[in-house]
Amino acid sequence: MVVGPSCQPPCGLCLLLLFLLALPLRSQASAGCYGIPGMPGMPGAPGKDGHDGLQGPKGEPGIPAVPGTRGPKGQKGEPGMPGHRGKNGPRGTSGLPGDPGPRGPPGEPGVEGRYKQKHQSVFTVTRQTTQYPEANALVRFNSVVTNPQGHYNPSTGKFTCEVPGLYYFVYYTSHTANLCVHLNLNLARVASFCDHMFNSKQVSSGGVLLRLQRGDEVWLSVNDYNGMVGIEGSNSVFSGFLLFPD
């Protein structure tokens, strides 16, 4: 049996299918040409990804970019979170004094001070002589009984105020003739006391309250009736003392 030269073997991926289809026919045909190729089979499942290839060579440098123009100003952003408190800075220079504040309430009474020693003024002097004082003149008392502050001056016969306030002045005189005594404050006559002689010896007195300022002077004087004496048992006394300081 001669085999025709037109028959060619199958190829490609369809070989397996053609082989399977041709198995029944081959049992019947003992000789002859191959059959017609069958239809293409269904595509197989996708294969797995292959392994990474080798790193390629370094590329050429790119073209330099052209600087762009500045864009418009953006919108104001939201305030950020407050930061941590910083360290205290150096102390600044002192400011100008402020205005005085309102007056506060009265405080508690303080400890009692040495009021008595700071506000004392007292004296007592006597006139010890049998001679009458000069008429129409100041009367000097030449013997000091007490004068701790030295506010009475025996040389001038005047008391000088050093502690302003209310004072009391008093005198007691012995006289053997008519007597008029004037109590003077600075250049003014404050009070006059006159006593006319009825017996061989008499006593008269007078007193006055005066409010004095620092530097005021107080003294006694007589007029033509000047029968004042000062002998043992018949003294003439002039006293003054501070009652209430200002």
Curated annotation (Swiss-Prot):
Modified positions (5-hydroxylysine) in chain numbering: K76
Post-translational modification comment from the UniProt entry: O-linked glycans consist of Glc-Gal disaccharides bound to the oxygen atom of post-translationally added hydroxyl groups.
Comment on protein domains: The C1q domain is the ligand-recognition domain, which specifically recognizes and binds the Fc regions of IgG or IgM immunoglobulins.
Keyword Repeat belongs to the record: yes
Signal peptide interval: 1-29
SS bonds (residue pairs): C180-C194
Gene Ontology process terms (BP): complement activation, classical pathway; innate immune response; negative regulation of granulocyte differentiation; negative regulation of macrophage differentiation; synapse pruning
Entry annotated with the keyword Ribonucleoprotein: no
Glycosylation sites: K76
Top-level taxon in the UniProt lineage: Eukaryota
Regulation (activators, inhibitors): The C1Q subcomplex is inhibited by sulfated molecules, such as triterpenoid sulfates, heparan sulfate, or chondroitin sulfates.
Domain Collagen-like, first and last residues per copy: 32-113
Compositionally biased tracts (Pro residues): 99-108
Identification of the protein by name: Complement C1q subcomponent subunit C
PTM annotation (4-hydroxyproline): residues: P37, P40, P43, P46, P64, P82, P97, P100, P106
Compartments, as annotated in UniProt: Secreted; Cell surface
Record's function text: Core component of the complement C1 complex, a multiprotein complex that initiates the classical pathway of the complement system, a cascade of proteins that leads to phagocytosis and breakdown of pathogens and signaling that strengthens the adaptive immune system.
GO cellular component terms attached to this protein's record: collagen trimer; complement component C1 complex; complement component C1q complex; extracellular region; extracellular space; extrinsic component of postsynaptic membrane; extrinsic component of presynaptic membrane; glutamatergic synapse
Main location: secreted
All residue ranges annotated as the C1q domain in the record: 116-246
Keywords, alphabetical: Collagen, Complement pathway, Disulfide bond, Glycoprotein, Hydroxylation, Immunity, Innate immunity, Repeat, Secreted, Signal
InterPro entries, per database record: C1q_dom, Collagen, Collagen/C1q_domain, Tumour_necrosis_fac-like_dom
Quaternary structure (record): Core component of the complement C1 complex, a calcium-dependent complex composed of 1 molecule of the C1Q subcomplex, 2 molecules of C1R and 2 molecules of C1S. The C1Q subcomplex is composed 18 subunits: 3 chains of C1QA, C1QB, and C1QC trimerize to form 6 collagen-like triple helices connected to six globular ligand-recognition modules (C1q domain).
Region (Disordered): 44-116
